[in-house]
Every structure is written in structure tokens, then in C-alpha cells.
């Protein structure tokens, strides 16, 4: 199989072909996802909660991300692999570049960073130095202490601010954008306004792609279950069939449905 590229996702956007992505943290699941047809994966700092058992993503380190990136890359050598830069790993453009180099050497194709227009200089610095960037707007878990919890973002006047941030990130060179926990109406505006692919989670079925935390897709998340989550394993009966169902429902816009969306 040929390696999946950003250009391929751009083609999907142009042709209005929705694509499914998922988080992965180890060799075995990465191989399973790749075998069943998922070609884009994220080593997310969500591993702090799903793998390490913390109550937020804040304790995750660059070394943690690099470790899991190496494992996922071995399991899915041809996938487009995104890796998060964790909390306080990109406070300055120079720090971002140093830490991006670590995860890129570990096997990432692209780094994901959370935040709006304040990241413009960082995005420019990274992309000018051959580090592809995926932005992340809406509910940005590293900002949980600012938000006062995991809450929907972008309602009212905040929606225009988010759209402006998205346009600024694209202009700075970002090649993908993740939108998390925003109203469907705003997600549609952002997706249509940007020329780069937009990947949603809790943003309705109007984005170019969809991502889920693998533990949510398999119904093994402890504690609070997000509204946008769906247990595909319960319906499909086994993990491989669950992954295939997830892909099929994303591509056909069945998932996420109205019951998984915000307004």
C-alpha cells in the first residue's frame, strides 16, 4: 500500500469524500486499524487519560508522545501519522521546533498543536522548516483549566473568533485542522471557509474527516462518556468489524448523527 499523504486528504476534501481517522497508541492497534482501512492516525496526548490514567492530558511529556509514536509507526508504516505536541511543549516557536523534531524523528508525519492566532509565528516557523502542522480549535483539552472543564466552544460571538483563528492558522501554513466540540453550524462555516481539510470530533457530520479516541469507539472509556462518542464494538461484535463499521458510517455521513452533535 502506498503511504497516505496530506495531498490525498486534500483530494478527498475537493471531491467531498469524507474520511475516518482514529487515535492509536501502540503497535497492535495501529496494525489492526491499518489492516481494516484507516490510513490516518493520531498519537494524541489523550493517552494521558486513556493509557496512563491521569484526569487530564497535562502530565503527558514529549518523551511519552515519542515513545507511542514509534510504536504506532511500526504497526502502521504507511499511515499518515499525526502526533500531538503536549502541554507546554510549544510555548515559544523555538521550543516547538525542538520538540517537533523529536516526534518527527520518532515517526510522525505531522505535529498537532492546540490554539488560535497566537500560534501564527509558531506555525510559520515549523512549516518553513519542513514540519507539517495540524491546528486544533474549539475544545482544546490542554486549556481545560482555563475553560473550567470540558465544555462546548464557539457559541455566539466566540464562533467568529474561532473562524478567524482557523483562517489565521491556514494562512500561516497549517495543512490540517481539528475542530472539537463546536456547534454543527460553526463547523460547517469553518469547513467551507478553509481550503485545508477539517477533521471533526463533536462537530457534527459536516467536516471533511472524523476522528474518535479509540477507547470511545470500542466503548471502553472509563467515567464520563462524551455525547459525540459511539460504541461501535457493541453493534459490530468484534474489533475489526467495529473499525469497518466506523469507517463506513463516517464515509456515508451516518456518523456522527444528530444525537452526537451540538447546536
UniProtKB/Swiss-Prot annotation:
<feature type="binding site">
    <location>
        <position position="84"/>
    </location>
    <ligand>
        <name>3-methyl-2-oxobutanoate</name>
    </ligand>
</feature>
<dbReference type="GO" id="GO:0003864">
    <property type="term" value="F:3-methyl-2-oxobutanoate hydroxymethyltransferase activity"/>
</dbReference>
<protein>
    <recommendedName>
        <fullName>3-methyl-2-oxobutanoate hydroxymethyltransferase</fullName>
        <ecNumber>2.1.2.11</ecNumber>
    </recommendedName>
</protein>
<dbReference type="Pfam" id="PF02548">
    <property type="entry name" value="Pantoate_transf"/>
</dbReference>
<dbReference type="InterPro" id="IPR015813">
    <property type="entry name" value="Pyrv/PenolPyrv_kinase-like_dom"/>
</dbReference>
<comment type="similarity">
    <text>Belongs to the PanB family.</text>
</comment>
<keyword id="KW-0479">Metal-binding</keyword>
<feature type="binding site">
    <location>
        <position position="84"/>
    </location>
    <ligand>
        <name>Mg(2+)</name>
    </ligand>
</feature>
<keyword id="KW-0808">Transferase</keyword>
<keyword id="KW-0566">Pantothenate biosynthesis</keyword>
<feature type="active site" description="Proton acceptor">
    <location>
        <position position="180"/>
    </location>
</feature>
<comment type="function">
    <text>Catalyzes the reversible reaction in which hydroxymethyl group from 5,10-methylenetetrahydrofolate is transferred onto alpha-ketoisovalerate to form ketopantoate.</text>
</comment>
<dbReference type="GO" id="GO:0000287">
    <property type="term" value="F:magnesium ion binding"/>
</dbReference>
<feature type="binding site">
    <location>
        <position position="45"/>
    </location>
    <ligand>
        <name>Mg(2+)</name>
    </ligand>
</feature>
<keyword id="KW-0460">Magnesium</keyword>
<dbReference type="GO" id="GO:0005737">
    <property type="term" value="C:cytoplasm"/>
</dbReference>
<comment type="subunit">
    <text>Homodecamer; pentamer of dimers.</text>
</comment>
<dbReference type="InterPro" id="IPR003700">
    <property type="entry name" value="Pantoate_hydroxy_MeTrfase"/>
</dbReference>
<dbReference type="InterPro" id="IPR040442">
    <property type="entry name" value="Pyrv_kinase-like_dom_sf"/>
</dbReference>
<feature type="binding site">
    <location>
        <begin position="45"/>
        <end position="46"/>
    </location>
    <ligand>
        <name>3-methyl-2-oxobutanoate</name>
    </ligand>
</feature>
<comment type="pathway">
    <text>Cofactor biosynthesis; (R)-pantothenate biosynthesis; (R)-pantoate from 3-methyl-2-oxobutanoate: step 1/2.</text>
</comment>
<keyword id="KW-0963">Cytoplasm</keyword>
<feature type="binding site">
    <location>
        <position position="114"/>
    </location>
    <ligand>
        <name>Mg(2+)</name>
    </ligand>
</feature>
<feature type="binding site">
    <location>
        <position position="112"/>
    </location>
    <ligand>
        <name>3-methyl-2-oxobutanoate</name>
    </ligand>
</feature>
<dbReference type="GO" id="GO:0015940">
    <property type="term" value="P:pantothenate biosynthetic process"/>
</dbReference>
Amino acid at each position: 500500500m502506498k503511504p497516505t499523504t496530506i495531498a490525498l486528504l486534500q483530494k478527498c476534501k475537493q471531491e467531498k469524500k469524507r474520511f475516518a481517522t482514529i487515535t492509536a497508541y501502540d503497535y497492535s492497534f495501529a496494525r489492526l486499524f491499518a489492516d481494516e482501512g484507516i490510513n490516518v492516525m493520531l498519537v494524541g496526548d489523550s493517552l494521558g487519560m486513556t493509557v496512563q490514567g491521569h484526569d487530564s492530558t497535562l502530565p503527558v511529556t514529549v518523551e511519552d508522545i515519542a515513545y507511542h509514536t514509534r510504536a504506532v509507526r511500526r504497526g502502521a508504516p504507511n499511515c499518515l501519522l499525526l502526533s500531538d505536541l503536549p502541554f507546554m511543549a510549544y510555548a515559544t516557536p523555538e521550543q516547538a521546533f525542538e520538540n517537533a523534531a523529536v516526534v518527527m524523528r520518532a515517526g510522525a508525519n505531522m505535529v498537532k498543536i492546540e490554539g488560535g492566532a497566537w500560534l501564527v509565528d509558531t506555525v510559520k516557523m515549523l512549516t518553513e522548516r519542513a514540519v507539517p502542522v495540524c491546528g486544533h480549535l474549539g475544545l482544546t483539552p490542554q486549556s481545560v483549566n482555563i475553560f473550567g472543564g470540558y465544555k462546548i466552544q464557539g457559541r455566539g460571538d466566540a464562533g467568529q473568533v474561532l473562524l478567524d483563528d482557523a483562517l489565521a492558522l491556514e494562512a500561516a501554513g497549517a495543512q490540517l485542522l481539528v475542530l472539537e466540540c463546536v456547534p454543527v453550524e460553526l463547523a460547517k462555516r469553518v469547513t467551507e471557509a478553509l481550503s485545508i481539510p477539517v477533521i471533526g470530533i463533536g462537530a457534527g457530520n459536516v467536516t471533511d474527516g472524523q476522528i474518535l479516541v479509540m477507547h470511545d469507539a470500542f466503548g471502553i472509556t472509563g467515567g464520563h462518556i462524551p455525547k459525540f462518542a459511539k460504541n461501535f464494538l457493541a453493534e459490530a461484535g468484534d474489533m475489526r468489524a467495529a473499525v469497518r463499521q466506523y469507517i463506513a458510517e463516517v464515509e456515508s455521513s451516518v456518523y456522527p448523527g444528530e444525537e452526537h452533535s451540538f447546536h
